[in-house]
């Protein structure tokens, strides 16, 4: 069960956490992006470049992931698709999405899109904090531990 990373928007510090975990646990990590990526030399870490275009990287992740795989993404619609396929979705802030929470997130995302379309400034997310990084690492470790027990 590999880790799939929506790499175009994934913070560098989160990629570094993933790289260390890949080496430590011998878990495949596949970064998917529509631009060239630099990854450390490793038999466990791969970069997959897809053509530029709307949702091309997302569609590649949905096509390739399987039940039980981990997908790291902040993209709510992508998270919803991989959850529907049986994969686990984790955002870079360490929030693990579930079928229940992803519906709520999709509704909020659609509402915010409507506000932005009407000209209301909604602002962006806060900068990634140390607490966010720790939460991400903890959730990643939980998934990796569960993967080990299943093997």
From Swiss-Prot:
Family, as annotated: Belongs to the UPF0178 family.
InterPro entries: UPF0178
Annotated protein name in UniProt: UPF0178 protein ESA_02916
Superkingdom in the source lineage: Bacteria
């Amino acid at each position: 069960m590999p880790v799939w990373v929506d790499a175009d928007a994934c913070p560098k510090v989160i990629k570094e956490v993933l790289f260390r975990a890949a080496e430590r646990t011998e878990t495949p990590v596949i970064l998917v992006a529509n631009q060239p990526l630099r990854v450390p030399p490793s038999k466990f870490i791969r970069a997959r470049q897809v053509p530029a275009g709307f949702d091309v990287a997302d569609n590649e992740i949905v096509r390739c992931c399987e039940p039980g795989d981990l997908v790291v993404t902040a993209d709510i619609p992508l998270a919803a698709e991989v959850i529907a396929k049986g994969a686990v979705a984790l955002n870079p802030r360490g929030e693990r999405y579930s079928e229940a929470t992803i519906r709520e997130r999709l509704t909020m995302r659609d509402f915010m899109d409507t506000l932005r379309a009407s000209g209301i400034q909604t602002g962006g997310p806060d900068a990634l904090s140390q607490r966010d990084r720790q939460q991400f690492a903890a959730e990643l470790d939980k998934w990796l531990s569960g993967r080990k027990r299943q093997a």
